[in-house]
C-alpha cells in the first residue's frame, strides 16, 4: 500500500481542515505562596470514577482537565476554557492552578498519589512512583488529540489503492505518527516552555536555561531499554506486549511516547478494529495563556500535522525516528536563543506547508501561520521558551508563574455568575452548564441560540431548554401559564385568590372599559408575556390619557390585554421545584435615590455601573432603562428624567418589581413564614408545574397563610422562571437552584458525589 502523495491528489476544494479535536490539560494545585496544595481533590467535583472532564492524574493535587470532542480547534479551546473555569472555581479560593509544566519547588515526600477508588489505578500510580520517582510525575503538560475528518479520510481513501478502510486508516495514522516522531523537534523548538527546573528538582546539576526539560530525557521517559518500533502497527503492538510479558512494563499505557494511538481499549484491537485518532502528548503548558495553549498554537499544530501527512513517510522508519529523537534531545536541551542546528532540516517542512496552503487555497490566516513558523525557524527569539527568558529571576520562574496563576484566578472569579466562553448564552443556562460540568454530567449544546442542551450520564439522557424546561413538565403546562387568563381560571377553580379584572382584544374595547375603573387602582398588562414586559401599574386612579397610553404599551407586546384590580401589598417571587419551594425573593422595583447633585438620568447611569447589571438576562441584575414606561412613572410622581432629585429621596421607575426590568432582588427564603411557601407550592401543583415561578402579593407577611385564609393574592405564575436572580441577589445569601434541577434530573449522580 502506498499512502504517500495522497494529499497532493485531492481536489483543491477537499475538506482539508475537517477534523475532530480534544485537549487534555494537567495542572498542579498550589496555594497563594506557590506551594503544593495538600487538600484532597474537591468533593464538589463529583466522583472521579466517572467524571468525564475533571480528573486527577498521578498526584492528588494534579488536576487533569479533559474536553469533549470538538469539531474545531476553536470549540476545543472553548470547552477547555469552560472546564478550566469550573475547576478554578471548584478548588479552594485560596488555591490556584500552576501555570508551568515544571512544578514549583517540591520534595518527593510531599507528593501524594491520587486517592482514587479504582484499586488498580492506585496500585499503578504507586508502581510508577517506585519505578520512576515521584517528582517526575508532577511534571504537567497538554495533550493534543486529533481525528482526521470523516469526509477527508474518505476522499483520501478513494484516491488510494486500498479496499479495506480500516487498514487504510491504520496506515494513514501510522504514517502521521512516524513523521510526527521524526519531526518532533519542531514542536519542542516552537512550543517548548520548560526552560528551568526549580531548585532541588534534579539530583544533579543540569545546565539551564534550556528549551524544554519536559521534552528531553530529563522529563518523564521510559527506561532506556524500552525501544518500541513504529515501523509497522504489528511491530508496535507486539513490542509492547512482549515488554509486558517480560515484566518490563506493567500495562500498555506505561509505554510513554510523544504520540499514542487511540480509540481501542487494548493495542491489539487496533489491528482489526482500527485506530480512531492520535494523541500528541509533548506540549508544554504555555503560561501566557490562561488555559495553557493558544489558538495560534492549536491551528499551527493542525497545519503541521497536515504537512507531516503531505511529506513522504521515512524509508527506514526505525533509523529516521532514532535520528529524530536525537535531534529533539539536542534541541530540547539547547539554550532558548540558540539557533537550530544544521541537521534540523526546516526547508522540507516549510515547503510542505507552502504547498499545502497553495494547493488547498487556504486563506490569509493560515498563510500567516506559515509565516510565523518560518520567522521562528529563522529567529529563535520568537519561540515560546525564548519569551520566558526575561521572566527568570534568580534561576527561578516561580514568581512569574505565581503572578500568572493569581491573574487567571482573579479572572475566573470575575463575573463569577457566568461560564467563561459561553457568556452569550442565557445566564440560567450558563449556570446549569457550570453545575453539569462540575457534577460530571456529559453535555452537548444542541442549539446555542435556543438554549437547548443534551445532558447524560451513562445511558440516562435528559434534554433541557432555557435552564429548567424539561421532560418533567407536561407540554400543555407552559402554554397554560403563558396565558394569564387561563392561569387565573385554573387557580380560581382550585380555590386560590386571584385579582378581578377583564380581557380586551382591541384598544377600543379597553377604552370603553374606562368608566368602570375610573377612580380605581388598576394594573394594565399583556395577556401572554413574561419578564414583566408591557405592564403598567396605577396605585392612584389613572387619567384617561395615561390609561390609554398604558393600553397602547400593553398592546405593543400582545394581541390581548388584561385590566385588573391593583392588589396592595408587597410582591414576592416563590421558586417552586417538584412541589417544593426552594427560594423566595422580595423584588424591589427599579429605583434611584437622590443625592441633591445629580439628575435622575445621571443617577440611573451611576446605578447601571454595578458589575452585576447587564443586558438580555446575562447578568444577575438588568440595566435600568428610561423608556416610555419609566418616564410615565416619573410623571405620575411629579418628576422628569433631567430633574435633580433631593438627597435621600427615593423614586421608583417601575411599579412592577421584575428583576428583568431593572429591579433589585432580596433573598427572604429563611425569614418568610413557611406557610406562604407551602401555599405557593400548592398553586404550582394545581397547575401541574414542575418548575414554576409564583408571584404573590402579601400585605402582611407576619400573618400565617392557609388556603382558607391565604392573606395573599396570586398575580402571576411563570413557566421557565429565571434562576439566577435567586442565586446572585442584591441582598441576602441567595439560593442555588440549578444544582437542585440537576439533582432531580439525575438522582443517581446526586447520590454518588464523593
Predicted regions and their residues:
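C-terminal active-site "lid" helix and adjoining low-complexity regulatory extension at the edge
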Residues: 634, 658-671, 685-689, 698-754
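A short glycine-rich, hydrophobically flanked beta-strand micro-motif that places a catalytic Asp/Glu
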Residues: 97-102, 317-323, 561-565, 572, ...
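Terminal catalytic/cofactor-binding subdomain
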Residues: 1-129, 136-138, 175
Amino acid at each position: 500500500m502506498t499512502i504517500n502523495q495522497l494529499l497532493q491528489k485531492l481536489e483543491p476544494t477537499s475538506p482539508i481542515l475537517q477534523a475532530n479535536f480534544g485537549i487534555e490539560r494537567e495542572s498542579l494545585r498550589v496555594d497563594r505562596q506557590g506551594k503544593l496544595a495538600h487538600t484532597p481533590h474537591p468533593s464538589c467535583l463529583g466522583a472521579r470514577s466517572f467524571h468525564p472532564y475533571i480528573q486527577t492524574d498521578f498526584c492528588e493535587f494534579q488536576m487533569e482537565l479533559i474536553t469533549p470532542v470538538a469539531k474545531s480547534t476553536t470549540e476545543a479551546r472553548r470547552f477547555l476554557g469552560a472546564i478550566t473555569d469550573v475547576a478554578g472555581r471548584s478548588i479552594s479560593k485560596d488555591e490556584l492552578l500552576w501555570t508551568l509544566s515544571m512544578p514549583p519547588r517540591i520534595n518527593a515526600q510531599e507528593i501524594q498519589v491520587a486517592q482514587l477508588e479504582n484499586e488498580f489505578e492506585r496500585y499503578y500510580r504507586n508502581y510508577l512512583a517506585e519505578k520512576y520517582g515521584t517528582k517526575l510525575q508532577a511534571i504537567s503538560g497538554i495533550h493534543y488529540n486529533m481525528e482526521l475528518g470523516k469526509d477527508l479520510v474518505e476522499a483520501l481513501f478513494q484516491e488510494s489503492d486500498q479496499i479495506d478502510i480500516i487498514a487504510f486508516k491504520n496506515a494513514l495514522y501510522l504514517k502521521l505518527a512516524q513523521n510526527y516522531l521524526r519531526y518532533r523537534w519542531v514542536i519542542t523548538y516552537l512550543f517548548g516552555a520548560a526552560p528551568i527546573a526549580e531548585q532541588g528538582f534534579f539530583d544533579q546539576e543540569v545546565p539551564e536555561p534550556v528549551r524544554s526539560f519536559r521534552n528531553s530525557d530529563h522529563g518523564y521517559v521510559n527506561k532506556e531499554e524500552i525501544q518500541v518500533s513504529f515501523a509497522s502497527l504489528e511491530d508496535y503492538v507486539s513490542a509492547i506486549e512482549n515488554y509486558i510479558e517480560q515484566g518490563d512494563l506493567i500495562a500498555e499505557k506505561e509505554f510513554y511516547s510523544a504520540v499514542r494511538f487511540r480509540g481501542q481499549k487494548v493495542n491489539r484491537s487496533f489491528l482489526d478494529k482500527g485506530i480512531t485518532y492520535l494523541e500528541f502528548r509533548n506540549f508544554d503548558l504555555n503560561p501566557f495563556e490562561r488555559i495553557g495553549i493558544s489558538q495560534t498554537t492549536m491551528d499551527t499544530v493542525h497545519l503541521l500535522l497536515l504537512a507531516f501527512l503531505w511529506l513522504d513517510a521515512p524509508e527506514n522508519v526505525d533509523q529516521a525516528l532514532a535520528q529524530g529523537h536525537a535531534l529533539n534531545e539536542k534541541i530540547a536541551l539547547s539554550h532558548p536563543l540558540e539557533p537550530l542546528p544544521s541537521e534540523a532540516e526546516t526547508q522540507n517542512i516549510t515547503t510542505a506547508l507552502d504547498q499545502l496552503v497553495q494547493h488547498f487555497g487556504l486563506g490569509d490566516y493560515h498563510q500567516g501561520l506559515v509565516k510565523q513558523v518560518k520567522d521562528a525557524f529563522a529567529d529563535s527569539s520568537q519561540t515560546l521558551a525564548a519569551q520566558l527568558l526575561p521572566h527568570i529571576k534568580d534561576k527561578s520562574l516561580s514568581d512569574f508563574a505565581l503572578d500568572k496563576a493569581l491573574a487567571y484566578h482573579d479572572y475566573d472569579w470575575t463575573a463569577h455568575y457566568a461560564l467563561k466562553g459561553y457568556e452569550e448564552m442565557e445566564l440560567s443556562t450558563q449556570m446549569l452548564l457550570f453545575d453539569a460540568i462540575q457534577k460530571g454530567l456529559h453535555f452537548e449544546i444542541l442549539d446555542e441560540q435556543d438554549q437547548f442542551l443534551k445532558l447524560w450520564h451513562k445511558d440516562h439522557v435528559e434534554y433541557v431548554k432555557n435552564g429548567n424546561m424539561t421532560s418533567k413538565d407536561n407540554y400543555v403546562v407552559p402554554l397554560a401559564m403563558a396565558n394569564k387568563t387561563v392561569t387565573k381560571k385554573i387557580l380560581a377553580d382550585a380555590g386560590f385568590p386571584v385579582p378581578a379584572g377583564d380581557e380586551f382584544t382591541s384598544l377600543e374595547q379597553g377604552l370603553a372599559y374606562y368608566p368602570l375603573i375610573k377612580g380605581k387602582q388598576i394594573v394594565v398588562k399583556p395577556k401572554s408575556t413574561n419578564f414583566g414586559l408591557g405592564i403598567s401599574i396605577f396605585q392612584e386612579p389613572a387619567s384617561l390619557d395615561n390609561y390609554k397610553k398604558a393600553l397602547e404599551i400593553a398592546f405593543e407586546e400582545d394581541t390581548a390585554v388584561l385590566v385588573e384590580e391593583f392588589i396592595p401589598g408587597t410582591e414576592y417571587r416563590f421558586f417552586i421545584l417538584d412541589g417544593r419551594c426552594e427560594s423566595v425573593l422580595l423584588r424591589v422595583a427599579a429605583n434611584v435615590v437622590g443625592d441633591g447633585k445629580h439628575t435622575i438620568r445621571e443617577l440611573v447611569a451611576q446605578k447601571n455601573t454595578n458589575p452585576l447589571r447587564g443586558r438580555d438576562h446575562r447578568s444577575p441584575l438588568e440595566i435600568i432603562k428610561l423608556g416610555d414606561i419609566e418616564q410615565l412613572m416619573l410623571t405620575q410622581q411629579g418628576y422628569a428624567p433631567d430633574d435633580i432629585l433631593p438627597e435621600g429621596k427615593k423614586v421608583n421607575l417601575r411599579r412592577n418589581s421584575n428583576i428583568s426590568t431593572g429591579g433589585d432582588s432580596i433573598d427572604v427564603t429563611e425569614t418568610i413564614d413557611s406557610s406562604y411557601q407551602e401555599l405557593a407550592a400548592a398553586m404550582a401543583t394545581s397547575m401541574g408545574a414542575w418548575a414554576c415561578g409564583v408571584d404573590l402579593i402579601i400585605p402582611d407577611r407576619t400573618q400565617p397563610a392557609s388556603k382558607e385564609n391565604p392573606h395573599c393574592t396570586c398575580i402571576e405564575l411563570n413557566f421557565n422562571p429565571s434562576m439566577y436572580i435567586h442565586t446572585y441577589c442584591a441582598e441576602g445569601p441567595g439560593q442555588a437552584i440549578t444544582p437542585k434541577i440537576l439533582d432531580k434530573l439525575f438522582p443517581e449522580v446526586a447520590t454518588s458525589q464523593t
